């Protein structure tokens, strides 16, 4: 209702101005009713991939400046905000492609990560130091919520011995006998980072973009597909591990790469589609997670590939909201950036320091909040 009233008021203002000076526009008055909230914004966050493993090893002065820009809620001496005040920080738990070097088949070192787990089954808590530095810098500036996510299981557990899906199909790059080991690894990482760095991961997502076609076709970065059944199996095992250890970290699903996969199938089959229904409709007996301990009734998705044209931007988010409401599921939009299909601003290559890209991203955020939120 409030959105409709605002649209009418703005249209009326435009018409009044078009009528010339003889018809002055009436005064408009807006009232913010803080006692009548229509939405709850839980977090304003960002991710450390694929940069903080490099930037986190820069000179401390530069790290501090970047951290201020990202996390600070303070003002400088002139009253200007020091930063954008992120409230949540996503940490990419690595799979070990950095240690493999060129043998990882991932061309860019920026797209590789270290792994805490070693080949002999022990842990090296000196790994991923750059990213961990930014965990600490975030906490020092008031960030209280942290989410860990994984693009791939550790290379010691994968079927092809890599952190990328090269040469495989659309199933999880995880050995059948390693599902329980993977769950223990995830729990060990949550406990290990809290013990060594004083950072608690409030949330963890075992699979990042398991429906994304990008991680099935070639070695661009760490990544593994997974079917809904494979995701559900992993989440149930991790839930059991958390319960046994009395851990309250919440397990998130599914960090979808495309809203269309949450609603139906898109560039895949039913095994990786209809995700809202698969995980939160009790009739989906093989994949239902609605009664699984440590799993909130919440879906995570990424705002890629449905950002243009403008009519699609809105329509897709309205459809998403309808499906979420049908199954009484909350929603977090947990990742976005400019991609190749964003042709209106020239695609995702190079740099743009003008307001053009900033306004385009703001439009995406607005539609995610207003129509999908």
Residue locations for each model-derived region?
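The feature captures the catalytic groove of carbohydrate-active enzymes
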Residues: 203-225
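Non-catalytic accessory regions flanking glycosidase/transglycosidase catalytic cores in CAZymes
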Residues: 21-203, 212, 230-267, 271-285, ...
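Alpha-helix capping and helix-loop boundary segments enriched in small/acidic/polar residues
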Residues: 173-180, 221-230, 311, 352-356
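Catalytic metal-binding/acid-base residues of hydrolase active sites
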Residues: 210-211, 257, 300, 304-305, ...
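Bacterial N-terminal signal peptides
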Residues: 7-16
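Short, flexible/disordered intra-domain loops and linkers
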Residues: 217-224, 263-274, 346-354
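Bacterial N-terminal signal peptides that target proteins for export
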Residues: 1-7
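Catalytic-core region of carbohydrate-active enzymes that cleave or remodel glycosidic bonds
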Residues: 303-373
């Amino acid at each position: 209702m409030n959105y409709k009233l605002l649209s009418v008021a703005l249209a009326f203002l435009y018409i009044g101005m078009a009528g010339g000076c003889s018809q002055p526009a009436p005064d408009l008055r807006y009232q913010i009713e803080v006692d009548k909230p229509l939405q709850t914004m839980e977090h304003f966050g960002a991710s450390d991939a694929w940069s903080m493993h490099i930037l986190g090893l820069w000179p401390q002065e530069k790290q501090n400046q970047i951290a201020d820009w990202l996390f600070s809620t303070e003002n400088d001496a002139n009253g200007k905000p020091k930063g954008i005040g992120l409230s949540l920080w996503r940490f990419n738990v690595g799979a070990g492609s950095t240690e493999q070097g060129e043998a990882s088949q991932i061309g860019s070192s920026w797209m590789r990560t270290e792994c805490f787990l070693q080949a002999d089954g022990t842990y090296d808590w000196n790994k991923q130091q750059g990213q961990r530095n930014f965990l600490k810098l975030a906490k020092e500036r008031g960030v209280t919520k942290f989410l860990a996510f994984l693009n791939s299981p550790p290379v010691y557990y994968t079927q092809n011995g890599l952190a990328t899906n090269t040469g495989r199909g659309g199933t999880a790059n995880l050995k059948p006998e390693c599902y329980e080991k993977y769950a223990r690894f995830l729990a060990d990482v949550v406990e290990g980072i809290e013990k060594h760095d004083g950072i608690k991961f409030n949330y963890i997502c075992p699979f990042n973009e398991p429906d994304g076609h990008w991680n099935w076709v070639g070695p661009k970065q760490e990544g593994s597909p997974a079917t809904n059944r494979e995701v559900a199996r992993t989440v149930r095992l991790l839930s059991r591990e958390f319960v046994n250890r009395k851990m309250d970290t919440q397990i998130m699903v599914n960090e979808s790469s495309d809203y269309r996969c949450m609603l139906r199938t898109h560039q895949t089959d039913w095994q990786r589609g209809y995700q809202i229904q698969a995980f939160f409709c009790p009739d989906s007996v093989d994949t239902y997670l609605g009664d699984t301990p440590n799993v909130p009734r919440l879906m995570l998705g990424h705002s890629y590939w449905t950002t243009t044209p403008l009519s699609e931007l809105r329509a897709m988010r309205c459809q998403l909201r309808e499906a979420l409401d049908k199954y009484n599921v909350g929603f977090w939009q947990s990742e976005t950036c400019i991609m190749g299909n964003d042709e209106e601003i020239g695609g995702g290559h190079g740099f743009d320091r003008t307001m053009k890209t900033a306004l385009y991203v703001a439009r995406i955020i607005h539609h995610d909040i207003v129509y999908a939120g």
